[in-house]
């Protein structure tokens, strides 16, 4: 394998300081070298266990430490999750992501999580989970069950991290990513813009991600969703150009990774989202609620895809599942469709 040079903080800072149009031009050039520029990867996300999390992440309404009005729910039954996955596939989804609000999975929950992964995979869907910290054995068990992707965000730079979270160390997050990678599972890891961090912190976050032994296959860039009752509810709004700039730098630094627009997309107008796609974003969550924060309504997503001439990526799945690719394309590109699965409606 060819040696991959490591990024330095000064190099990343130089990217952030580039004139925006020059930065976008470079990011789009890099993007076109590695991806079909009009294709966007589309995922569906379901919260399989909501609220009552013991962590103190200051941005998160799922923490038991904050009064946000969120009703806690137990881990969903396996069949409930699989029924949701069936609906997702019937409507054209190719990847099904399952998220649970806890610090780490208990051993008693592992058999149920394995059954969820196995059931989703049996449908010909890609399976993704975000469950918090994993042990080496837990990562291997999920890999053996067939898990394709594991999401575990770094959130921000190591230097700013302690201002946001105290119940889980930065190194613990890095260790989980290493265990996931060693188990043979693809890594999904990114962060949040708008926590009160500086541009240097944004550079530091992307530096950590890009300098991993293997960069994440998927890099979600979230815009803070300010939820009443959380400590960050009164944070300043994120400037749209600052967010777009972060997307562009992520694309340049991690040219073969999918850069995903995740939480906060409902706060962006069409023009901001369009510039994010121009900056190299090529993945979204569609037609669902991002755990406990809203995503744009499906019809708005469809309209934007049509306006920009974007198409859902034709993801490689099990043989015989080409029909679901066609259904997703039809749903995204055909006006007035309402058949797409909405996880938030269950």
UniProtKB/Swiss-Prot annotation:
<keyword id="KW-0408">Iron</keyword>
<feature type="binding site">
    <location>
        <position position="188"/>
    </location>
    <ligand>
        <name>[2Fe-2S] cluster</name>
    </ligand>
</feature>
<feature type="binding site">
    <location>
        <position position="57"/>
    </location>
    <ligand>
        <name>[4Fe-4S] cluster</name>
    </ligand>
</feature>
<dbReference type="Pfam" id="PF04055">
    <property type="entry name" value="Radical_SAM"/>
</dbReference>
<dbReference type="Pfam" id="PF06968">
    <property type="entry name" value="BATS"/>
</dbReference>
<feature type="binding site">
    <location>
        <position position="60"/>
    </location>
    <ligand>
        <name>[4Fe-4S] cluster</name>
    </ligand>
</feature>
<feature type="binding site">
    <location>
        <position position="128"/>
    </location>
    <ligand>
        <name>[2Fe-2S] cluster</name>
    </ligand>
</feature>
<dbReference type="InterPro" id="IPR024177">
    <property type="entry name" value="Biotin_synthase"/>
</dbReference>
<dbReference type="GO" id="GO:0051539">
    <property type="term" value="F:4 iron, 4 sulfur cluster binding"/>
</dbReference>
<feature type="binding site">
    <location>
        <position position="260"/>
    </location>
    <ligand>
        <name>[2Fe-2S] cluster</name>
    </ligand>
</feature>
<feature type="domain" description="Radical SAM core">
    <location>
        <begin position="38"/>
        <end position="256"/>
    </location>
</feature>
<dbReference type="InterPro" id="IPR007197">
    <property type="entry name" value="rSAM"/>
</dbReference>
<comment type="subunit">
    <text>Homodimer.</text>
</comment>
<feature type="binding site">
    <location>
        <position position="53"/>
    </location>
    <ligand>
        <name>[4Fe-4S] cluster</name>
    </ligand>
</feature>
<dbReference type="GO" id="GO:0005506">
    <property type="term" value="F:iron ion binding"/>
</dbReference>
<dbReference type="GO" id="GO:0051537">
    <property type="term" value="F:2 iron, 2 sulfur cluster binding"/>
</dbReference>
<comment type="similarity">
    <text>Belongs to the radical SAM superfamily. Biotin synthase family.</text>
</comment>
<dbReference type="InterPro" id="IPR013785">
    <property type="entry name" value="Aldolase_TIM"/>
</dbReference>
<keyword id="KW-0808">Transferase</keyword>
<dbReference type="GO" id="GO:0009102">
    <property type="term" value="P:biotin biosynthetic process"/>
</dbReference>
<keyword id="KW-0479">Metal-binding</keyword>
<keyword id="KW-0093">Biotin biosynthesis</keyword>
<dbReference type="InterPro" id="IPR006638">
    <property type="entry name" value="Elp3/MiaA/NifB-like_rSAM"/>
</dbReference>
<comment type="function">
    <text>Catalyzes the conversion of dethiobiotin (DTB) to biotin by the insertion of a sulfur atom into dethiobiotin via a radical-based mechanism.</text>
</comment>
<comment type="pathway">
    <text>Cofactor biosynthesis; biotin biosynthesis; biotin from 7,8-diaminononanoate: step 2/2.</text>
</comment>
<feature type="binding site">
    <location>
        <position position="97"/>
    </location>
    <ligand>
        <name>[2Fe-2S] cluster</name>
    </ligand>
</feature>
<dbReference type="InterPro" id="IPR002684">
    <property type="entry name" value="Biotin_synth/BioAB"/>
</dbReference>
<keyword id="KW-0004">4Fe-4S</keyword>
<dbReference type="InterPro" id="IPR010722">
    <property type="entry name" value="BATS_dom"/>
</dbReference>
<keyword id="KW-0949">S-adenosyl-L-methionine</keyword>
<dbReference type="GO" id="GO:0004076">
    <property type="term" value="F:biotin synthase activity"/>
</dbReference>
<keyword id="KW-0411">Iron-sulfur</keyword>
<keyword id="KW-0001">2Fe-2S</keyword>
<protein>
    <recommendedName>
        <fullName>Biotin synthase</fullName>
        <ecNumber>2.8.1.6</ecNumber>
    </recommendedName>
</protein>
